[in-house]
């Protein structure tokens, strides 16, 4: 028997963005009638590869073959013409339209005589495609009346109208109930039986082993291998995903821990945190790891007062505190550096100095209620020198600085308030290697001075490299905690995907 021809074959695909090589000579195969899992840590390159396949990005190098024939994917339309469709985690249905209007959006059927949309034909065809995936939804229903699982069925039916041969599903069960998830699996089985190749992206191990036939793994923008699901287990798959040792690039500093600074008990919020409890000491960096959507940022924003807690208590230095808004957190000495520094951390149209003193203007008010510019300038210059911010002057627009220097300005903004607890979310995202090390040194200095630090990061070597303890979150809950000496990438990944033993 000859070798099977894959439905999809990607060979030597590379893609660079300014300063970053997102994909480096990546290959991928998927077969018709099979579900292929695409696995990798956050930042491994999964999304970039799928955006190239679906026409969102253009590849720099490489080839794409469908059923042995090379195709050139120049955009979303050409991808769809080649039979490639992606169903994003954030569904793109329009709530104010009916089911059939959504299914045929952009591909409406018009009457030959009037030129108007043939609603009857639209409904009939929609019903046919829905029946093909075993779905009984009235084509006339408004999409706003459907649940998330039903909306997902609309997206799948829409893919079938475009004669999709390859369907990419990106974290499809994230917002689904158990019942909706089982329904989706039945639909995937129907699609598989029709000979469609499914590429399934998920961090939920139990799903991968339940519905997938093969797995393809990326790590740090490179292809690390593939395997038949029947030939591997959890441990082997996790080893393929992480597989690297920590280099000596993290200047960890061991300092004596002080008194209890922060205690969180049974904290929950409607944005996705469920009963979180943990402690943090002075002179300690607590790393928080977890996959995208695990609730790490939501936990930080609840402690910071951006999200309102629905239950739980927060204590600072042994005393219960009430945090109902951001100003409550700041007044109690809790500060938060957002993962998105350009949208939430700084004001790009303002100067370095203006950004730095933005949260502390009252300090510079004189008796006439105007700003003491001399005193303000003195503090700005102090922090520019102290944390080595590379800027021509304090008047420079922050948007003109590098990512690392922008991050230092935001850090200086909070340090001016002398916080007790500093929460820093993705501290080195989009920052070059040299600047990363400077940020780590700064965090170590703050730790040595007695600050209590929470560091959220998707970069496992970073978490392992500079944290004193590591807390892992999965689906809104704290799934485990590891001491620095016992933690490694595999033990963190197991907790991140919900494997506790």
Swiss-Prot record:
It holds the Pfam family ABC_tran. ATP binds at residues 40-47. Residues 8-245, 255-500 form the ABC transporter domain. Its EC number is 7.5.2.7. It comes from the Bacteria. One of its GO terms (molecular function) is ABC-type D-ribose transporter activity. Disulfide bonds: none annotated. CDD domains: ABC_Carb_Monos_I (cd03216), ABC_Carb_Monos_II (cd03215). Coiled coil: none annotated. Its main location: membrane. It catalyses: D-ribose(out) + ATP + H2O = D-ribose(in) + ADP + phosphate + H(+). SUPFAM superfamilies: P-loop containing nucleoside triphosphate hydrolases. Keywords: ATP-binding, Cell membrane, Membrane, Nucleotide-binding, Repeat, Sugar transport, Translocase, Transport. The keyword Nucleotide-binding applies. InterPro entries: AAA+_ATPase, ABC_carbohydrate_import_ATPase, ABC_transporter-like_ATP-bd, ABC_transporter-like_CS, P-loop_NTPase. GO terms for cellular component: plasma membrane. Belongs to the ABC transporter superfamily. Ribose importer (TC 3.A.1.2.1) family. The complex is composed of an ATP-binding protein (RbsA), two transmembrane proteins (RbsC) and a solute-binding protein (RbsB). Part of the ABC transporter complex RbsABC involved in ribose import. Responsible for energy coupling to the transport system. This is Ribose import ATP-binding protein RbsA. It comes from Clostridium perfringens (strain SM101 / Type A). The gene is rbsA.
């Amino acid at each position: 028997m000859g070798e099977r021809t894959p439905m999809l074959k990607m060979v030597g695909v590379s893609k660079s963005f300014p300063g970053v090589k997102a994909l480096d000579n990546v290959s991928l195969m998927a077969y018709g009638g099979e579900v292929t899992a695409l696995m990798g840590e956050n930042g491994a390159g999964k999304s970039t590869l799928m955006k190239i396949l679906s026409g969102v990005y253009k590849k720099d190098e490489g080839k794409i073959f469908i059923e042995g024939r090379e195709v050139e994917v120049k955009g979303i339309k050409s991808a769809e013409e080649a039979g490639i469709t992606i169903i994003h985690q954030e569904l793109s249905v329009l709530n104010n339209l009916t089911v059939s209007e959504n299914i045929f959006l952009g591909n409406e059927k018009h009457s030959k005589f009037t030129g108007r949309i043939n609603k009857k034909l639209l409904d009939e065809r929609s019903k046919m495609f829905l029946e093909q995936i075993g779905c009984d939804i009235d084509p006339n229903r408004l999409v706003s009346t459907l649940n998330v699982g039903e909306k997902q069925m609309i997206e799948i039916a829409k893919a079938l109208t475009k004669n999709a041969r390859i369907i990419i599903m990106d974290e499809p069960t994230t917002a689904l109930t158990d019942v909706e998830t089982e329904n989706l699996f039945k639909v995937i089985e129907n699609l598989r039986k029709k000979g469609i190749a499914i590429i399934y992206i998920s961090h939920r191990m139990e799903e991968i082993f339940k519905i997938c036939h093969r797995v393809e793994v990326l790590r740090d923008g490179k292809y690390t291998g593939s395997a038949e699901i029947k030939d591997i287990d959890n441990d082997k798959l996790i080893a393929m995903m992480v597989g690297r040792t920590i280099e000596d690039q993290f200047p960890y500093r061991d300092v004596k821990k002080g008194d209890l600074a922060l205690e969180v008990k049974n904290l929950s919020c409607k944005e996705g945190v469920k009963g979180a409890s943990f402690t943090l000491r002075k002179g300690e960096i607590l790393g928080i790891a977890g996959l995208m959507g695990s609730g790490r940022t939501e936990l930080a924003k609840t402690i910071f007062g951006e999200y309102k807690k629905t239950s739980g208590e927060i204590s600072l230095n042994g005393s219960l505190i009430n945090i109902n808004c951001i100003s409550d957190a700041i007044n109690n000495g809790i500060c938060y550096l957002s993962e998105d520094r350009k949208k939430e951390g700084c004001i790009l149209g303002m100067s370095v100095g203006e950004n730095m003193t933005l949260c502390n203007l009252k300090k510079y008010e004189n008796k006439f209620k105007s700003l003491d510019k001399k005193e303000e300038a003195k503090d700005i210059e102090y922090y520019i020198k102290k944390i080595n911010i590379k800027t021509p002057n304090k008047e420079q627009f922050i948007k003109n600085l590098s990512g690392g220097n922008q991050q230092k300005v935001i850090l200086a903004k909070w340090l001016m308030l002398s916080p007790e607890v500093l929460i820093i979310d993705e501290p080195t995202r989009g920052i070059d290697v040299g600047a990363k090390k400077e940020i780590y040194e700064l965090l170590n200095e703050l730790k040595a001075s007695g600050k209590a630090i929470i560091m959220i990061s998707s970069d496992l070597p970073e978490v392992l490299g500079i944290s004193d303890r590591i807390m892992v979150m999965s689906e809104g809950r704290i799934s485990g905690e590891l001491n620095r000496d016992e933690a490694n990438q595999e033990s963190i990944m197991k907790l991140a995907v919900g494997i506790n033993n």
